Amino acid sequence: MNEELQNQFMALDVYNQQVQKLQEELSNIDMMIMELLKSIESMEGLKTSKEILLPLGAGAFVNAQVQNPEKIVLSVGVDVLLEKDVDEVIVDFQKSVEELEQTKELVNTQIQKTNQEIVKLRSELEKRAAAIEQRSAQMKPRTN
């Protein structure tokens, strides 16, 4: 197998790995969006009910009353907490969802472009394989 053909097979492998990583990134983006939307829903729920289920860990929860539902405490770094109005946090989270949706579109576009390159490269490799087979068949001595 010549060097150019080897390079094309390696490129095909790299493209496939890129698509896999981009799909993993899409999955992570989807999880972040779902988490943000769930948080927004929970904060909206605080406007009508002060009762929440508080996670204790390992699948255990306790019913709790929120004393100050107008304020949300956010973790903004290691051991750094910030208190903000609930409506402000909801707006911030909605903006984050919008930004993630835009990022998701960019990742999808990159996946499509990479898949197009994969299709193009596979087509070239199939043509080369057919040409090699044809040459190989022509070189074989014919037996009668």
Curated annotation (Swiss-Prot):
A biological process from GO: protein folding
Localization per record: Cytoplasm
Highest taxon above the source species: Archaea
Gene Ontology MF term list: unfolded protein binding
A GO-annotated cellular component: cytoplasm
Pfam families named among the record's database cross-references: Prefoldin (PF02996)
Record's keyword terms, sorted: Chaperone, Cytoplasm
InterPro entries, alphabetized: PFD_alpha_archaea (IPR011599), Prefoldin (IPR009053), Prefoldin_subunit_alpha (IPR004127)
UniProt record similarity statement: Belongs to the prefoldin alpha subunit family.
Its biological purpose: Molecular chaperone capable of stabilizing a range of proteins. Seems to fulfill an ATP-independent, HSP70-like function in archaeal de novo protein folding.
Subunit structure: Heterohexamer of two alpha and four beta subunits.
HAMAP family on file: PfdA
Record protein name field: Prefoldin subunit alpha
UniProt source species: Methanococcus maripaludis (strain C5 / ATCC BAA-1333)
Gene that encodes it: pfdA
